[in-house]
């Protein structure tokens, strides 16, 4: 978060930011950033469902499309976005709906905000600036150490 805020503060010409992220917790990170980042420039999260060694790896195209969205004037004011499989989702609506296949993310009840294809970014103008409830939250310079316990239901480990 600090890096995002510093990047935007230090470079007024910066169009947007792309963050590559694993897909298991991508929606949670997007949600958190949507609560904390108040800059109107887009922060775009992107991941891949197939490994880079797959014959049809989706990562390179997803990354390219995320960069297209990040520099698009249409993404300005849209808040934090997730770009996967040619679709653009808002951080507050997106969820992972499948663990296999490239169409793993969806915005149930809303659908994607837009899409990206060979012709470019298709994203309607934002009706209003996103509200950011915790934008002024102070981030500590030191975070406490937190233990993480791993547990697998019914597993005999």
Task: Give the positions of each predicted feature.
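ATP/NTP phosphate-donor binding region
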Residues: 1-9
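General structural feature for long, well-ordered alpha-helical segments within catalytic domains
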Residues: 3, 22-25, 29, 59-62, ...
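Accessory alpha-helical/coil subdomains and C-terminal extensions
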Residues: 90-154
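Residue-level detector of conserved catalytic or cofactor/ligand-binding positions
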Residues: 66, 152-157
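Internal gly/pro-rich beta-alpha loop/helix module
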Residues: 45-119
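Alpha-helix C-cap/termination motif
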Residues: 10, 36, 72-76
